[in-house]
Amino acid sequence: MRRTTRRTTEKASYSHLLPASGDLDELVARVATSRSRTITLMPICLPEDAPSGLWIATGARDYIVYPDDADAQWRSGIVCHEIAHMLLGHDPRPGTSDLGGLVAAAAPSIDPQVAARFLHRHGYADAVEADAENLGTRLAAELGAAHTAAQGHRDRVFDRMR
C-alpha cells in the first residue's frame, strides 16, 4: 500500500463511532448522527454488471445501495466501504457508465439531476478507492471483532445464570 494512502486513513478518527455490540446498524446510526445526515440502507436487486455498493448523496440524506442477496458479512463489507468514503470526506462524483437503470431501481424518488452526483466506482484503481477500501476493511474487521466479543460476553453471562 502506498504511504500516502496509509497516512490518509490513519488520520481518520472513527473509533468513537464503533459500537461495542459490533452491530452494523448501530454503526450506521452513529455515523449518521456524527454527520448530521440520515443514512438509509437500500438492499435492491442489482444487475450483474452493477457495482456491488453505491453511495448516493442527496441534499440532507445519504443512501447506501447494496445487493439484496448479500449475506451479513458481504453487506457489512459493502456498507463499511461506503461509510469509509463518508468518513474520509470523499465527494460523490459522477460515474463513468450509464447509471439510469440503477438509479431508477435504487431511488426512483431522487431527481435525475441529483442522481448525477452519485458516488459510483468500479475497481480499486485510484487513491480514493484504495483509501476507502483500507478504512472500510478496518471498520468491518473491528466491527466483526466487537460483535464476536459481545457475543462471548453474553454467552458467559447466560452460563453464569444457569
Report the location of each language-model feature.
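Aromatic-enriched hydrophobic runs in primary sequence
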Residues: 65, 79-82, 124, 161
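A broad, low-amplitude sensor of folded, mature protein cores
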Residues: 1-4, 70-72, 81-83, 154
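Amphipathic alpha-helical interface surfaces
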Residues: 27, 75-79, 83, 95
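Active-site scaffold of zinc-dependent metalloenzymes
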Residues: 40-76, 83-89
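Metalloprotease/metallohydrolase-associated module, dominated by Zn2+-dependent proteases
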Residues: 1-33, 92-162
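A general "mature secreted/periplasmic domain" signal
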Residues: 28, 33-45
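Generic alpha-helix signal with a bias toward terminal, lower-confidence helices
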Residues: 43, 51-53, 78, 95, ...
